[in-house]
Design a protein with these regions (language model features):
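Composition-driven, intrinsically disordered low-complexity tracts enriched in small residues
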Residues: 174-218
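Extracytoplasmic surface signature
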Residues: 1-179, 190, 216-218
Length: 218
C-alpha cells in the first residue's frame, strides 16, 4: 500500500521469520514484526496488518510468548500499522537479532484458533489471507476454526469483537493474556455503567475492534 512494501518469510529460506515493511523511497525497514514461526502471506487493511502463519513467539516485540512446546501456534495474527516500540534483543537460538528496529503492537484480541489439516502432509493450517475494508478471508488446509468444523476457508467480519477460541486448548487457540475462555464468553455480554462493552473485548480500544458494529465469522 502507500505506506510501503510488505514482506514475510521463514528462516529456512532466509534469515527472518515474521513480517516487515520497507519504505518505498529509502528502502529502510520502518516496521518489523519479529515473530518466530513461518509466515506465508500478509494483508494490510483498516490500519491493521494481518498475516497467515504458524507464529509461536512474538515476545521480541512484546507479544505472546513461545508455547510451541505445548503445541500452541497462532495461524492468524494482527499487528498495528504504526510502530509502537522497537524490537528487543533476540535470545532464542537459531534466529537472527533485529534489536532496535521499529516494531508494531501484536493484538492479543485477534488470535483465532485454526486446526491443522493434512492435505499437504506439512502439518499446516492457513496459507493465505485476503480481504478488504469489510471482510477478512483466510484460506488453507485447516479443518476447524475455534473448535468448530470449518474446512479450507474462513471469513471474518471487520466489525466483530474478540475472535479468539472460546476454549483454550483448541489448536492455535491460545488467548494470550486473556486465556480464561469461559470468562471471555461471559464478559462479552457485560457492559459498563455507560452501556459500553468491556474494553478487554475491544482489542484495539475501539467500539468493537474496528470502530464498527457487528459479529465475527461464518
Amino acid at each position: 500500500d502507500s505506506k510501503g512494501l510488505y514482506g514475510v518469510g521463514y528462516s529456512q529460506e532466509g534469515t527472518f521469520e515474521g513480517m516487515f515493511r520497507a519504505n518505498w523511497t529509502t528502502g529502510d525497514i520502518d516496521l518489523m514484526a519479529d515473530c518466530h514461526g513461518d509466515t506465508y502471506d500478509v494483508l494490510p487493511t483498516n490500519d491493521v496488518i494481518y498475516v497467515a502463519s504458524h507464529a509461536h513467539d512474538c515476545s521480541n516485540i512484546g507479544g505472546f510468548a513461545d508455547r510451541s512446546n505445548e503445541g500452541v501456534y497462532h495461524h492468524a495474527v494482527g499487528f498495528s500499522s504504526t510502530a509502537t516500540g522497537t524490537v528487543r534483543s533476540n535470545t532464542a537460538s537459531g534466529y537472527s537479532d533485529y534489536a532496535g528496529l521499529p516494531a508494531p503492537t501484536q493484538y492479543n484480541g485477534f488470535l483465532p484458533g485454526f486446526e491443522n489439516g493434512n492435505y499437504t502432509g506439512l502439518s499446516q493450517a492457513v496459507w493465505t489471507v485476503e480481504g478488504n475494508s469489510q471482510y477478512l478471508v483466510y484460506g488453507g488446509e485447516f479443518i476447524a476454526v475455534n473448535g468448530t468444523k470449518q474446512q479450507g476457508i474462513a471469513r471474518f467480519s471487520m466489525s466483530g469483537g474478540d475472535a479468539n477460541a472460546a476454549q483454550p486448548g483448541d489448536e492455535g487457540g491460545d488467548n494470550g493474556a486473556n486465556d480464561d475462555g469461559k470468562q471471555d464468553k461471559k464478559d462479552k455480554d457485560k457492559k459498563d455503567k455507560k452501556g459500553k462493552k468491556n474494553k478487554q473485548d475491544d482489542w484495539d480500544n475501539q467500539d468493537d475492534w474496528d470502530n464498527q458494529d457487528g459479529g465475527w465469522w461464518w
